[in-house]
A protein has these predicted regions:
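Active-site neighborhood of phospho(di)ester-bond hydrolases with catalytic His/Asp-centered motifs
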Residues: 6-9, 45-48, 79-81, 106, ...
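A general structural detector for well-ordered alpha-helical segments in enzyme core domains, enriched
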Residues: 31-35, 61-69, 93-97, 118, ...
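Catalytic pocket-lining loop regions of alpha/beta-barrel enzymes
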Residues: 103-104, 119-247, 255
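Acidic-and-aromatic substrate-binding clefts and catalytic sites of carbohydrate-active enzymes
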Residues: 17-27, 51-60, 83-89, 110-117, ...
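Active-site gating/metal-coordination segments in enzymes
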Residues: 56-151
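Divalent metal-dependent hydrolysis catalytic cores, especially in the metallo-beta-lactamase
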Residues: 23-25, 30-54, 75-83, 103-107
Length: 292
């Protein structure tokens, strides 16, 4: 199979080198680019951590990511983020970030329930401005970062119905654990990767079948395990929804890799995943939906 240069729809970087430890660090573009090349990634979309630089998160602000993308547009694009303030100015702020080059909103992590008025303002404006949203989901307000939904994702379904023009990209454990019909309901278990075979009746497949504005960010081990836990089911899901799934990594440094990318390569090489689905997931959808 001819090598395909992937587009990674979910990457975190620091604009400048930061202090590092052996356990954790955030790469800058110079360090990440060779790693991307090793993984067959030609371009990556940067996730913003905040609208404005904050001491507790000294990397990944809108301004930082905009600067990275403007300095090297052949390798980087960026999504903007919003801080939870001034709801009435949300449309204007998002329009300004789009004018500055933002291709979407992400990753949206405001720790409020999905039907919160501020989040609904974001969803509405995103639809009007044609800015897709990559969201991180949490099982409970105050438990972990991310927008919040209940077991079974009832609030997400309401949002998909209420904002049909808005493209929602699901991400994180609490979203992808709902791939299986036996998804847990306890908050700790909802924040874990899925294990074992996928049981029928999962809410993620059901919502994908019902709502064409639901998309999937295939990053990290949350999405990786959703696919790899049951390879036969995973391959069927990839084929069925190939138009709405995006290869992504969620890497923050050049020491990280996730297994799904190589697995997609292997499955396509042996004919288990169609070349058409592979090309859409790994590159074509990002080009079509985000204009990359």
């Amino acid at each position: 199979m001819e090598s395909l240069q992937k587009i990674d729809l979910h990457l975190h970087l620091s604009r400048i080198p930061l202090p590092r430890t052996e356990q954790m660090w955030v790469s800058d573009p110079a360090e990440m680019l060779p790693h991307m090349a090793e993984l067959g990634i030609q371009k990556a979309v940067l996730m913003s951590t905040s609208e404005n630089s904050q001491p507790q998160m000294p990397f990944g602000s809108n301004a930082d990511n905009r600067a990275i993308a403007q300095a090297d547009p052949s390798h980087f694009a960026w999504m903007c983020n919003l801080d939870p303030l001034d709801p009435d100015t949300i449309p204007e702020r998002l329009a300004a970030y789009k004018a500055e080059g933002a291709v979407g909103i992400g990753e949206l992590c405001i720790n409020r329930r999905l039907d919160d008025p501020l989040l609904e303002k974001i969803f509405a404006a995103a639809g009007e401005l044609e800015l897709p949203i990559t969201f991180h989901m949490s099982p409970e307000v105050g438990y972990s970062y991310g927008i919040v939904d209940d077991p079974g994702l009832p609030l997400l379904e309401c949002a998909l119905q209420k904002f049909p023009k808005t493209k929602f990209l699901g991400h994180s454990q609490t979203f992808w654990i709902e791939m299986s019909g036996d998804a847990p309901t306890e908050k700790e278990a909802r924040n874990q990767w899925g294990k074992d075979s996928v049981a029928p009746g999962g809410r993620v497949p059901e919502l994908f079948a019902k709502y064409p504005n639901l998309y999937g960010d295939l990053s990290a081990n949350s999405a990786g395990q959703a696919i790899l836990r049951d390879p036969a089911f995973g391959l069927e899901f990839l084929e069925t929804y190939a138009d709405r799934l995006f290869f992504a990594t969620d890497m923050v440094n050049a020491g990280m890799t996730f297994p799904l990318g190589a697995w997609l390569d292997e499955q396509t090489a042996k004919g288990a995943l169609s070349t058409q689905a592979y090309q859409k997931i790994c590159r074509g959808n990002a080009q079509r939906v985000f204009g990359l």
